Every structure is written in structure tokens, then in C-alpha cells.
Amino acid sequence: GDAMEQQEAQRMRDEGQDELHQALLNILANREEELRATIQAIDTRQLRQILSLLRSCEVMEVVSEGGGLPVAFDASIRFSHLGKRCVSSAVHEKNLAFAQTLTPKDILIVLSASGQSARLEEVSAAAKGRDVPVLLITCDSHSPLAQLADYVMTASNREQRLIEGSHAASLLSPNVLIEVLYY
């Protein structure tokens, strides 16, 4: 009976490995699809305008909240490396106060998966009121924040398509869009 028990244990180990391997392949397939959709959704004419704005702007403010903050901070660091004066904070009051000092020569970049945030809307409206160009990176191009933005880049979010209303968004797509802008 010992040999049979060992075989059974080995079989269960193999199945566990297969399941894990399959899970990894699923993640890869989902991410590939998400990236492809994100890149394909880019309007190159608009992208040229955005890139030219980013090159010529004097100051950049990058705002987000919650899960989007790591992407905002990463963007801020990247753009600082390009010699841009770039500001990003997790504190809403700071973001708002800073937006109220921006000029039309600057740019506000807003990162929001859902495109719905009263605080980010307040910051966007403040910038817009001063004729500052506003770029939104979002999963929902018809959201309230999109209405306030001059430029909208859509990050594909496969999870969101699977479970509507779920914005536990992958940070992959927004990160890739930042990479495109940084490129």
C-alpha cells in the first residue's frame, strides 16, 4: 500500500503544480490583452499634442488618490528626471492649493481608474478655471472627470470588464501610458 500512497501523493503534487502553472498563464494572458487594448486605444494625433504639451510645459502637477497614488508618484519621479518641475502629493488640500497656482503654460495630469472623485474633480476644475491643460488617464472615458479634461487617455482594465463597477484596477495600463508619455 505504501507505493500506491506515494503515487497518489505525487499525483496530487503534480496537479497542484499544473493549477499554479495555469494560474500564471491566465495572469499573463489577461495582462497581454490589457496592454494590447490600452496601446491600441491610443489616438496618435492626440498623443502628439500631449507629448508636445509635456515637452513645452513649465510645471506639471500629477494627482490621484487611493490605488492610483503609486502611479502618480512614479510619473512625477520620471518626469522630474526629464528636468521638469513636477509636483505630486497624497494630500488633497496641497493638490488643490497647487492647482490654483498653475498657469496655461503648465499641465495637470489626473489619474483615476473610475473617473469619479469629488476631490479630483475639484482639483481639475480649479486648473481648468485657470486655462491649464488637463490630461486624464482613466478606465472610463465617459466619466465626470473626463468631462473636465482636455485630453483623455483610456487605460484598458480587463478586471473592470469582467466585473463591471470594480475599480480594483490593475496599475499596469496606467503605468504603461505613463511610460508612453515619458518615452
Locate the predicted segments by residue.
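HTH-adjacent hinge/linker in prokaryotic transcriptional regulators
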Residues: 1-46
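Glycine-rich phosphate-binding loops that contact phosphosugars or nucleotide phosphates
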Residues: 55-176, 180-183
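A ubiquitous structural signal for well-ordered alpha-helices
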Residues: 31, 38, 50-53, 123
